[in-house]
Amino acid sequence: MAVITDSLNAKTVLDLIGEERTVVVRRDKEWKPGELVEFYNELGKVIQQNDKVTGTIGNGELVKVRQNGLFAGKEDGELEWHSAGMNRTGHDDIVAMYMHQTAESGGDTYFTDHQRAWDDLDEETKNICRSVKSKTVTYTSKMKLEKMHYKNVFSDERTMMEFRDIDGKTSFEKQTPRKDLVTNHPINNKEGLYYPWSVIRGFTGLDRDQQHSLYYKLKNHTLQEKYIYMHKWERNDIVLSDQHHSLHRRDAYTGDRELWRAGICLR
């Protein structure tokens, strides 16, 4: 994790995201929606949602994350471990989070580092990981939202079916049953685990016992405290979160917490 309090040079920020996975921008100022979008566009291309998606701001680059909105999570506000692209082809490279209004209590966010976790694995496990693909959960449009993992992400089925990637295609139509478990990061080209374990149900090329063993070995390994950063939000904080070698989750909270989310794709 890195903290920036002064220069917002785009190359410096991107390099930090590649090396640290999580970058906190902390300045004593309120950001207007247009200022945020301008800053984010220096880092890449901001994904634009249409007005059918619940809680869009301005031209759709920013989406409100709050109770009864997008990424609302459970009834108490907890949102389990996830990343932007979990079971689809192509996804945001960076998720930008701006804290417009903090919670009365709770709402801390946790970020994992799957690049450092990968570095610490033994070579035998690394070679196994390189040789397999993850088997990911996919859903059909006939299924009810409450039966899907997406129930913690989308507030309603229309938003689920309309949420789009940078190419204009909906996230729902880009689902895939297989994903690489090991990827090279687009910023620093280093290997790391692409491991959104909540939507993974096994691995290709391994028998059932081997799949079970590898799944829990990687899950327990990546969730060690030394690979997790906990962020306690202050008003006007920006957190830039890598979506290749990291997951994030949110604690339960009370109060009228409102965060503005944006998805950024590298140019």
Task: Please report, for each region that a protein language model flagged, where it lies by residue.
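Non-heme Fe(II) oxygenase catalytic core, chiefly the N-lobe of the double-stranded beta-helix
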Residues: 2-235, 244-267
